Design a protein with these regions (language model features):
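Active-site acidic/histidine proton-transfer and metal-coordination neighborhood
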Residues: 62-160
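N-terminal pre-domain/capping segments
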Residues: 1-56, 60-82
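Alpha-helix-loop-beta-strand connector modules within alpha/beta enzyme cores
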Residues: 34-54, 111-125, 148-155, 223-235
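Short, well-ordered coil/turn segments that N-cap beta-strands
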Residues: 13-15, 46-52, 86-90, 123-127, ...
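Residue-level preference for long, well-ordered alpha-helices that form the structural scaffold
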Residues: 29, 33-36, 66-69, 73, ...
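Active-site beta-loop-alpha junctions enriched in small/polar residues
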Residues: 1, 22-24, 56-59, 97-99, ...
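Histidine-acidic metal/acid-base catalytic patches
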Residues: 144, 148-257
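Conserved, mostly hydrophobic/aromatic
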Residues: 9, 55, 73, 84, ...
Length: 257
């Protein structure tokens, strides 16, 4: 439950957290009671945990050619945006999806329209946050140029970006070395704007640079390495950005000490 998630974050010594508020593998969504959401906010505040982020379900795909599933994805993001507002969360992080060999111009326009629709119906106090992709085939938003295009075309200051370090590395952006991270983050700023970076998924990579596969590893046990994460954390772009772990865990049960 939600309250147990806060307890778990506190036990780990976390200062920020990310959670689902429904099964990430299904469309079903049950709205939480006002009492439950109020208790969540109070407990998170008492433990001084924040900012808090929700992660959208994995079925959301704004690039799909299946219009019924596109509609379900838009509705799911709407549910999560309202829940985030009621829970005191900063926003909803989600994967934009992929397309099936469709013209990117068509997919781009569909994705922008979907983003605009979600934001038009959403509370004004929460962000809709696109997570960068790992560069897998036909994935939307694996390059800074694509992400920047979506942000600019949507034209809403509530649309933000979460940078997943493993996805970034897998897509060919070398953030693990001082000689290259400056160039990478300069490109991010030029294409997207550093003001639109609001969260980092801090994950090491099971596969090497530009592998174009989504494979997370514990920090220091992958190709980015501990020195790589020290490089990332020292860079000015990340000084005030919350870091969220999505790693297997040393015991295989998710983030741990």
């Amino acid at each position: 439950g939600l309250l147990k998630a806060v307890d778990r974050a506190f036990e780990l010594g976390a200062e920020t957290m990310q959670l689902f508020c429904s099964s990430p593998q299904g469309w079903a969504f049950k709205a939480m009671s006002q009492t439950e959401m109020s208790e969540f906010r109070k407990k998170a505040t008492s433990f001084d945990i924040g900012p808090i982020f929700l992660h959208g379900i994995y079925l959301v795909n704004l690039g799909t050619s299946n219009q019924a599933n596109l509609r379900k994805g838009i509705e799911s993001l709407g549910h999560y945006m309202r829940a985030a507002s009621n829970m005191g969360a900063s926003g909803v992080i989600f994967h934009a999806g992929s397309h099936n060999n469709t013209s990117y111009e068509v997919v781009f326009r569909q994705t922008v329209n979907a983003l605009k629709e979600v934001l038009a119906d959403a509370p004004k106090d929460v962000w809709l946050i696109i997570e960068n992709g790992a560069g897998m085939r036909n994935q939307i938003g694996s390059t800074f140029r694509e992400l920047g295009g979506l942000v600019k075309a949507t034209g809403d200051s509530r649309l933000k970006i979460c940078l997943d370090t493993q996805h970034c590395f897998a897509a060919g952006y070398n953030i693990a070395h001082e000689e290259t991270i400056a160039e990478v983050m300069t490109e991010f700023d030029q294409e997207i704007g550093l003001e639109n970076l609001v969260a980092v998924h801090a994950n090491d990579s099971k596969q090497p640079l530009a592998c174009r596969v989504d494979r997370h590893e514990n920090l220091g046990e992958g190709y980015i390495g501990l020195d790589g994460f020290l490089t990332i954390m020292k860079h000015p772009a990340f000084q005030t950005i919350p870091f969220l772990l999505e790693v297997p865990g040393f015991k295989g049960g998710g983030p741990d000490n």
